[in-house]
């Protein structure tokens, strides 16, 4: 069952779901709560790497990832990050989210941004039960013009579903949780897959 706005407010009031900083009740409507863009970004560098072998030896994948991903880029409040057509970038939500082990979250981009060509999450929009941390966004500009993205702008909406029971392996309890407690735009850790 997906939570409605009054249930989202109640879950926040009771501390069942945590969103820090807490959004105002005006940002909780229908079945979603708005989230804003943080100030941590990562991009792909100009590079000569012909490809990344996603199933290659762990050491080679790690070396390839280090060659192509930038260090963390911090954008000051009021400044803009420009995402050019055909570019992919990583960023975070301003808010940090904590879910219990019986709630799954879903991130959706804003329709107004999609109509300009901005994909907020390329494919990974599930927030696992037991999640704690900021949500990394996988931005892609499918439009024709560069887009100026500024910290604190409304970037997406979260919705929440109650599971049929409590997850036996919630994200925060898993030893293989690669992005546990993330607070910045962490690049891919596919090299840590088994």
From Swiss-Prot:
The name this protein goes by in its record: dCTP deaminase
Protein EC: 3.5.4.13
Residue spans of biased composition, Polar residues class: 180-194
One of the GO BP terms on file: dUTP biosynthetic process
TM annotation in the entry: none
Organism phylogeny: Bacteria, Pseudomonadati, Pseudomonadota, Gammaproteobacteria, Pasteurellales
Residue numbers annotated as active site: 138 (proton donor/acceptor)
Gene symbol of the encoding locus: dcd
Enzyme class: hydrolase
């Amino acid at each position: 069952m997906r939570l409605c706005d009054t249930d989202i407010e109640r879950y926040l009031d009771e501390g069942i779901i945590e969103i820090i900083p807490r959004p105002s009740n005006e940002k909780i409507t229908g079945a979603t709560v708005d989230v804003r863009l943080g100030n941590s970004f990562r991009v792909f560098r100009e590079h000569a790497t012909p490809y990344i072998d996603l199933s290659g030896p762990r050491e080679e994948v790690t070396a390839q990832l280090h060659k192509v991903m930038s260090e963390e880029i911090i954008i000051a409040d009021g400044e803009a990050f420009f995402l050019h057509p055909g570019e992919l970038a990583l960023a975070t939500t301003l808010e940090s989210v904590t879910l219990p082990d019986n709630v799954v979250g879903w991130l959706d981009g804003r329709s107004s941004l999609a109509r300009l060509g901005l994909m907020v999450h390329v494919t990974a929009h599930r927030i696992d039960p037991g999640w704690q941390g900021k949500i990394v966004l996988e931005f892609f500009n499918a439009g024709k013009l560069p887009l100026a993205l500024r910290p604190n702008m409304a970037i997406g909406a979260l919705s929440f579903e109650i599971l049929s029971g409590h997850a036996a392996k919630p994200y925060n309890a898993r030893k293989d949780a690669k992005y546990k407690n993330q607070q910045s735009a962490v690049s891919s850790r596919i090299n840590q897959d088994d």
